[in-house]
């Protein structure tokens, strides 16, 4: 659930939640997260994993690709910054 988005669309914050599952992700944005409840695993494209539990705080950088694995229903606070992409014009 999104709580705020800036008028230019570059900044947003809210609460995300998901039931158990596993899916591929690719981030064009920088995302700060704090896990409010649950357990998930973030897998990067090189096969590294990070176990995420209640109270964990972390940043997913723009350009990250990998997958989210939700092991137990997970809720997180997110803060997203979407950088402006230079079109070269």
Regions found by a protein language model. Name each.
Residues 43-45, 69:
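A generic structural motif
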Residues 23-25, 38, 46, 52:
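Amphipathic, hydrophobic secondary-structure cores in small proteins
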Residues 9-27, 61-62:
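Conserved short histidine dyad/triad with adjacent acidic residue
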Residues 18, 27-42:
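Short, conserved beta-strand element in jelly-roll/cupin
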Residues 46-62:
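Short acidic-glycine-tyrosine-enriched beta hairpin
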Residues 1-10:
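A short, N-terminal "cap"/entry segment at the start of jelly-roll beta-barrel domains
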Residues 62-85:
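Ligand-binding loop in jelly-roll beta-barrel domains
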């Amino acid at each position: 659930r999104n709580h705020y988005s800036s008028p230019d669309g570059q900044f947003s914050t809210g609460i995300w939640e998901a039931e158990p599952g596993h899916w591929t992700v690719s981030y064009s944005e920088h995302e700060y997260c704090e896990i409010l409840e649950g357990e998930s695993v973030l897998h990067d494209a090189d096969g590294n994993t990070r176990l995420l539990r209640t109270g964990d705080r972390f940043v997913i950088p723009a350009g990250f690709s990998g997958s989210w694995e939700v092991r137990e229903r997970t809720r997180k606070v997110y803060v997203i910054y979407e950088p402006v992409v230079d079109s070269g014009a």
